[in-house]
Amino acid sequence: MAERRFAAMRRLAGALALAGMIFDSPQALALTARDASAVVGLIEALQPEFGQFAYDEEIAADWYERDAADKGLIGTAGFTADSWKVALGETMRGFLATMPVAELDAIFAKLRNAISGMRELTEAQKTETIDAIDEEVEGLMILRTEGDPFADVVRPLTPKIRSLILGPVMGQ
C-alpha cells in the first residue's frame, strides 16, 4: 500500500516538475514589446551581412549560429538559441496577423502573375512553381492565424518589419 502511494506521489511530483519546466520555458512566455523590438532591430542589423530575411525555423537557427560565431548580437540582446527562435517566430506570426488578407492575396497574385509571364519557363514549370507558391500561401495563412495573440504587441513595429522583409521583395 505504501509502495503504491509512493509511486503515485512520484508520478505527481514528476508531472508537477514537467509542468514547471513547460510553463517556465520561453515557449510559454508571451511575446513582449521589448523582445519584438529587439528581434526587429536584430533583423535590421544582421540582414546586410546575412542576406534578405525570410522566416522559418531553420533560418532562425542559422542566423543564431552564424551570429554567435561572429558578433554575438543576438546573445547580447538576451536571447538564447531557443528564446530567439520563439521570439522571432512569434514576431513574424504577429506581423502576418497584422496584415490584411487582401494585401497578402495581392502580393501572391502579383507573384503568380510574374511567374505566369516568364517566357523562360515551360508551362509545366510554371504550373509546378505556382502550385508550390500556393502551398506556401496555405502555410502562411496558418502562421497568420497563429499570430493573433501577438498582433497587438507587433503592430507598432509593422511598418519597420514591412520595409525590412517586404520592401526589397516588392521593390520598395
Predicted regions: what is each one?
Residues D62-E138, E146:
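Mature extracellular/secreted ectodomains of secretory-pathway proteins
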Residues A2-A13:
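Bacterial N-terminal signal peptides that target proteins for export
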Residues A28-G72, D148-Q172:
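Immediate post-signal-peptide N-terminus of mature secreted/exported proteins
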Residues G20-Q27:
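C-terminal segment of classical bacterial N-terminal signal peptides
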